Amino acid sequence: MSSQLGRKESIYEEDDSDNLGQKDKSILYTNPQIKYIKSDSFEKLRLRSLIAIGNPIVDISSNIEEDVIDKFGLKWGETVFANESNVGFFKELEKNKNVKYIPGGSIQNTLRTCAWCLGMEPGRDKTFTITMLGATGKDSYRNKIIDALHFAGVKDLLECIPDKETSRCGVGICKKERCLLPEIRASNMINVDFIIDNLKKIDDHDALLLEGYFIQERYEICRDLCKRFKQKRKTVILTLSAVFMVQTYYDKFIELANYSDLIIANKAELEELAKEKDKENKDLFIKISKKLVKKKRLFIVTDGKKGVIVAKYDYKRGTMDFILRGFPKPVKSEDIVDLNGAGDAFLGGFLSQYMLGKSFEACCKAGNDVAGIIIKNIGCTFPKNFKINFAD
């Protein structure tokens, strides 16, 4: 298998044995005061470092009237990508005096949450390394993103595309419902040369996290990074991101899932990957596993109020073992402000305890607890005096 990226040097080495194809200190950036218990022995840690590739985005968030989404052809609870007919939605949001500019994007939200839950501090943490890989434009949005990452203790490995603008996402909120309008600009333009020039830094990480949204334009980079990490016997984590993404890029998701050790999805995304509807959970997992290369693989699946399922495929026996179903704590409807970022925060909380080597029960509890905090705020942000205890 050879790289299709058009440069003599590939992201991965050929291997015939491989059979897989000024900083804002406002509430938006406030570090929570977290009480947690680290493993007594670092030998218990599953992962010391994590790098994620995805779309660095600034969310432009504002309350809107109900008729605004009809005006621009948007849908509550769904994502519609920006085009000429709906790009005016951003001006509609910015007319609101309470509009907020929040560093966001699925992977950025997850990494910042993970770092917060690990109690990481900018430039001081010697135990863990968390890095975001991507691309931005040369503008004020880039500065906002880098400031937010650094304040959370996350390193940036962000290519600067001078002639493009940083990606943005319009977030309209009305009666606790939301609509999303991402405009993916510079983040789609990351160059393979930038990846190759930074391979040493990338190789220093124990695990790779892939944002499903990112494969839309940069699938080859994702595939080759997956192969490189697997050749080095490192961990690959894949998020499915959205039902329409799995529908549109089904074969690509299947190939990336073949490399993955952990697959993160909600129930609807899992059904789309299995090409089955209304099946029992066990049947869905088995159907998916039959489509993939036989290897150890974890599934972490969120299903709203029905909780979180963690399941493990035993390739030697050809069976699917359900490890647990974790339930979120109920949140009063009047306390819910914005559901945007809840899933990202869940994954961040889950991964923080996974890195520490904690039980899957502890991982799910952390994810659910953090998501419960996030939905009480606008975007993936924490209140000033946020405290949480992740002890088993």
Can you name each region flagged by the protein language model?
Residues 67-95:
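Short catalytic helix/loop segments, enriched in acidic residues and glycine
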Residues 200-201, 253-256, 292:
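Structural alpha-helical scaffold elements that stabilize or flank donor/cofactor-binding regions
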Residues 53-55, 134-138, 173-175, 183, ...:
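Cofactor-binding loop segments of dinucleotide-utilizing enzymes, especially the Rossmann-like FAD-
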Residues 1-56, 60-63, 277-392:
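Conserved phosphate-binding/catalytic region of the ribokinase-like
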Residues 152, 157-162, 169-218:
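Conserved phosphate-binding/catalytic loop of the ribokinase/pfkB sugar-kinase fold
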Residues 4-32, 38-42, 84-168, 391:
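Substrate-binding N-lobe of the ribokinase-like
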Residues 20, 27, 207-287, 297-298, ...:
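Conserved beta-alpha-beta core of the PfkB/ribokinase-like small-molecule kinase fold
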Residues 115, 150, 230-231, 293:
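Anion (oxyanion) recognition and catalysis
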